[in-house]
């Protein structure tokens, strides 16, 4: 994706020194801080939080 400043246009991977290209826990090419809400609670489900080591938003396996 040549329009994404985080993406190396040749490899489509994060540019050198950057952690990520996209996903809910990626902000300005870096992983978001652990504990940042990446998916708000709905119904009886709980919030999902970034881990600080990945750009993915892991699902919280617990219910309220």
Curated annotation (Swiss-Prot):
Record localization: Secreted
Primary location recorded for the protein, binned into one broad class: secreted
Domain Disintegrin: 1-64
Protein origin, superkingdom: Eukaryota
Database matches in InterPro entries: Disintegrin_dom, Disintegrin_dom_sf
Disulfide bond listed as a keyword: yes
Keywords, sorted A to Z: Cell adhesion impairing toxin, Disulfide bond, Hemostasis impairing toxin, Platelet aggregation inhibiting toxin, Secreted, Toxin
A Pfam family annotated for this UniProt entry: Disintegrin
UniProt short sequence motif Cell attachment site, positions renumbered to this chain: 42-44
UniProt GO molecular function: toxin activity
Cystines in this chain: 6-29, 20-26, 25-50, 38-57
SMART domains, sorted: DISIN
Example of a GO biological process term: cell adhesion
Gene Ontology, cellular component aspect: extracellular region
Expressed in which tissues: Expressed by the venom gland.
SUBUNIT field: Heterodimer with subunit alpha; disulfide-linked.
Similarity remark: Belongs to the disintegrin family. Dimeric disintegrin subfamily.
Other comment: Negative results: does not interact with the collagen-binding alpha-1/beta-1 (ITGA1/ITGB1) and alpha-2/beta-1 (ITGA2/ITGB1) integrins.
Function: Strongly inhibits ADP-induced platelet aggregation on human platelet-rich plasma. Also avidly binds to the laminin-binding beta-1 integrins (alpha-3/beta-1, alpha-6/beta-1, and alpha-7/beta-1) in an RGD-independent manner.
Protein name: Disintegrin lebein-1-beta
Organism of provenance: Macrovipera lebetinus (Levantine viper)
Origin organism lineage: Eukaryota, Metazoa, Chordata, Craniata, Vertebrata
């Amino acid at each position: 994706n040549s329009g994404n400043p985080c993406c190396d246009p040749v490899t489509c991977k994060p540019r050198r020194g950057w952690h990520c290209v996209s996903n809910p826990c990626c902000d300005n090419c870096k992983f978001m801080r652990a504990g940042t809400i990446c998916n708000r609670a709905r119904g009886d489900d709980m919030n999902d939080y970034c881990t600080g080591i990945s750009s993915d938003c892991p699902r919280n396996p617990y219910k309220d």
